[in-house]
Amino acid sequence: MARDREHRAEREDRDNTFVDKLVHINRVAKVVKGGRRFGFAALVIVGDQKGRVGFGHGKAREVPEAIRKATESAKRALIRVPLREGRTLHHDVHGHHGAGKVILRAAPAGTGIIAGGPMRAVFETLGVHDVVAKSFGSSNPYNMVRATFDALTNQDSPRSVAARRGLKVSQLQSRRRVEDAEATD
């Protein structure tokens, strides 16, 4: 039993090479009777650059320990995001968390990652090469990351939309061409 678990963990580590990015470190203080006890909080983004990404938060008395805890937390919270042609999003999407709002837009090849701060780290670890993103409201890294993840969880591939509607992918795309032709007339 234990041997199976170890073998599975080894296989997962070998198959999944993750890239991690440290987004934010915060020094926090706990006031106790004898003064202040300082600690550190870390926010880390982890991804495989093939459509899986997660974020984690870790706290500890030392910075490396906080980063390690955050990385482990991020690996446990991975989500899969469908990518178009392995380089961009399928459609434009909005997300929010608290007072932070983000707009993510699919972009043509060669655009690059046009996003600020924590959002850029999310896209780099996710494996997106072309995207335009804008954040509004809160510039707190935690809120920006959570708003970005909220938007990414609302991302649907044409295949999943077609399955939900009981259609074929080609029928979805033919409807889109008809609507585009009517709009230009």
From Swiss-Prot:
Residues 18-81 form the S5 DRBM domain. GO terms for biological process: translation. The keyword tRNA-binding does not apply. GO terms for cellular component: small ribosomal subunit. One of its GO terms (molecular function) is structural constituent of ribosome. It holds the Pfam family Ribosomal_S5_C. Coiled coil: none annotated. Keywords: Ribonucleoprotein, Ribosomal protein, RNA-binding, rRNA-binding. InterPro entries: Ribosomal_Su5_D2-typ_SF (IPR020568), Ribosomal_uS5 (IPR000851), Ribosomal_uS5_bac-type (IPR005712), Ribosomal_uS5_C (IPR005324), Ribosomal_uS5_N (IPR013810), Ribosomal_uS5_N_CS (IPR018192), Ribsml_uS5_D2-typ_fold_subgr (IPR014721). Belongs to the universal ribosomal protein uS5 family. With S4 and S12 plays an important role in translational accuracy. Part of the 30S ribosomal subunit. Contacts proteins S4 and S8. The N-terminal domain interacts with the head of the 30S subunit; the C-terminal domain interacts with the body and contacts protein S4. The interaction surface between S4 and S5 is involved in control of translational fidelity. This is Small ribosomal subunit protein uS5. The lineage of its organism: Bacteria, Pseudomonadati, Pseudomonadota, Alphaproteobacteria, Hyphomicrobiales. The gene is rpsE.
